[in-house]
Amino acid sequence: MCIRDRKKSEGLCVVSFSWIFAIILASIPYLFFGISPVDALFEATSGITATGSTILTHFNYPNTVFFWRSFTQWLGGMGIIVLFIAILPQFAIAGRQMFFAEAPGPTEDKFTPRIKNTAAALWKVYAGLTIIEIAFLKINGMSGFEAVCNSLSSISGGGLSPNSQSMIGCSYPLLWITAFFMFFAGVSFNLQYKAWVKLNPLVLFRNEEFRTYFSAIFLIGILLSISLFFNMHYDLAGSITHSFFNVSTLVSSTGFCSVDYTKWDYTSKLLLFAIMLFGSCASSAGGGLKVMRWLLVFKIIKTEMTKILHPKAVCNIKTGSYSVPKEILDQTLMFVAFYFVILGVSAFLIAVLEQNTTIGLTGAVSAVGNIGPGFGAIGPLGSFAPLNALTKLILIFDMLIGRLELIPILVLFQKDFWVLKR
């Protein structure tokens, strides 16, 4: 194994074991409140990976428990490893390789020359948005404690709320404020930083991935609003508000809810399930397959169709002005295939264990995509507590590999990874 490969392996190894260690540490406080070890591990994994699934069946715990849940999500949203690099300069083992492993999804570039500067810049945007959201929620009538917890949860793409009803019953202004910040939780923080530096929001719309992300939310939001208006008989304001709130929460993998959408009609639930698979932008706090990968997959399909019609055509696949190398395209196809294999296997195992295909399918999608709630018994007002212990362990594994984008965890199971050749 060459020096470069070994450094990359070190980065992957440190990332994986740091997350596992962080999850174990995060689970300890739950044990003091009578929560079983498996459930404590599940809740901690859900927090650190910013998934938002919960095993809590009541909310009679002290506020410290709910703050801890929200804080673990906030740390996990951008990535504990990036935080370490930003505040612990002496932690310099394979720094760039760790950022490569941690940054979610394929990225266009590293926008500052030093990795520590990059991490610090990302955290300035992340912390700044959090503080702004807390202020807006408090000004619009939310209690100070809930404003802090919900802001930590929404900007991280987590979704664990101190309120058993999530955000059901909140005023429309509170829902729109939260939806706005959830939307940006799913936007590349690299891109947001550039927009802040240039004081020009139009920078966002020059990015192809952002335009696709924005368009998908707008399109699904409009279709869902129409469905709610005609099929569920919401008024116009209610249909638009609940539509865009719940689309934003699922596409950014946050997991809040403004209503129990499991009671919606089939068409509305199908639209929500579609946006669950879509995912957020690369280098965002959100989860899912990532918009950039969908873009590349569709461009690959379009290119192959062109080659069928014009065999001698020379086709380059680009994102913006960047020509994507074949190696990245191959990796993207491999990742997408592997992603759906993991989803399929997990859904099958969970469906068999729970004897419920809805729990199996939506549970796997929500765990690997770090979304949080699914449909049925594990919907936004449900709990994962009644599930089989083995099901919870499968979901824990899914949440972790989903947050680390499959490869850093799965590569640990390769024998060659542990063999250091000269």
Annotate the PLM regions.
Residues 4-422:
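Membrane-proximal intracellular helices of multi-pass ion channels
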